[in-house]
């Protein structure tokens, strides 16, 4: 199977008067089920590790796989033959209440698929995942 190259991103954000460091590391994970696309090509799925520090102390740490988003994948085409493509800090949607990360599920090399927002409350509350229909790039967007 093909493994996408690892990807490391780091961001700094000042929110609510505090400084947050956000580290996002994507890597192929051979312990996850192998994904086969519609052409029969096999891929290792990705794991994304997120670590957030606040004033240099660890604030949030979690690993994500496609399984975390499975309940939001509405069509079998969204779930089969796709991997967790990656995540990024969303500075426009983050504010004094929450850090928000964008995530995308899709086919390797295509860069299209359902998009999600991961919300991490700054008060230490439970993180949540929401499907982001505005950023969705599945190609079924309706236009007026």
PLM region spans:
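Blade-terminus and WD-like Trp-Asp/Gly-His loop motifs, strongest in beta-propeller folds
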Residues: 14-16, 93-95, 143-144
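Short, surface-exposed coil-to-beta transition loops
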Residues: 45-47, 111-116
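Acidic, glycine-rich flexible loop segments
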Residues: 72-114
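Surface-exposed acidic loop/strand-edge motifs in secreted or periplasmic proteins
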Residues: 2-86
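Short, low-complexity, Pro/Ser/Thr/Gly-rich segments in the mature regions of secreted, periplasmic
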Residues: 121-144
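Short hydrophobic/aromatic-rich beta-strand segments that constitute the beta-sheet cores
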Residues: 60-61, 101, 127-130
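A short, polar/proline- and glycine-enriched secondary-structure boundary/capping micro-motif
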Residues: 34, 71-73, 111-113, 138-144
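A short, structured loop/turn motif at beta-sheet edges
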Residues: 52-59, 89-97, 119-126
């Amino acid at each position: 199977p093909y493994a996408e190259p690892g990807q490391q991103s780091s961001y700094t954000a000042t929110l609510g008067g505090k400084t947050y460091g956000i580290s996002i590391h994507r890597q192929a994970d051979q312990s996850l089920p192998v994904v086969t696309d519609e052409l029969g090509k096999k891929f290792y799925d990705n794991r994304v590790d997120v670590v957030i520090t606040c004033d240099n102390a660890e604030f949030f740490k979690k690993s994500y796989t496609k399984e975390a988003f499975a309940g939001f994948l509405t069509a079998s085409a969204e779930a089969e033959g796709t991997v967790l493509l990656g995540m990024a800090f969303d500075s426009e949607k983050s504010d004094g209440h929450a850090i928000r990360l964008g995530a995308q599920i899709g086919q390797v090399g295509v860069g299209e698929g359902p998009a999600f927002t991961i919300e991490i409350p700054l008060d230490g509350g439970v993180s949540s995942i929401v499907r982001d229909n505005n950023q969705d790039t599945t190609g079924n967007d309706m236009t007026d």
